[in-house]
């Protein structure tokens, strides 16, 4: 997908408290799939580390959540959406660290 010049990319990385727990992983993935229903999201991807091995690559996270929005305003709307707030309430106990990278075009 080509990102519009005003587009906004929101990339979230989750480190699970119990990375060996298939149940916790599944619960987070189910939560993200529900979260994808927020109307301002253009597209999304739920990913895992690719297993590449170079010094510059961090493979220590458990799940990534890549979101595309039409604008920064749409991303702000997403942040306050009840679906997003419910996700945080129901799933935040699963992770011990979250790191987010937000990008826009030059």
PLM region spans:
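An amphipathic, aromatic/His-enriched active-site/gating alpha helix that lines ligand/cofactor pockets
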Residues: 38-40, 68-101
């Amino acid at each position: 997908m080509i990102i519009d010049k005003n587009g906004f990319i929101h990339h979230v990385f989750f480190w699970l408290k119990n990375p060996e727990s298939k149940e916790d992983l599944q619960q987070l993935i189910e939560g993200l799939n529900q979260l994808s229903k927020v109307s301002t999201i253009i597209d999304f991807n739920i990913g895992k580390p690719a297993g590449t091995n170079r010094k510059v690559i961090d493979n220590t996270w458990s799940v990534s959540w890549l979101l595309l929005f039409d604008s920064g305003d749409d991303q702000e709307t997403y942040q306050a959406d009840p679906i997003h707030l419910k996700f945080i309430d129901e799933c935040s106990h699963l992770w011990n660290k979250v790191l987010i990278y937000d990008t826009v075009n030059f």
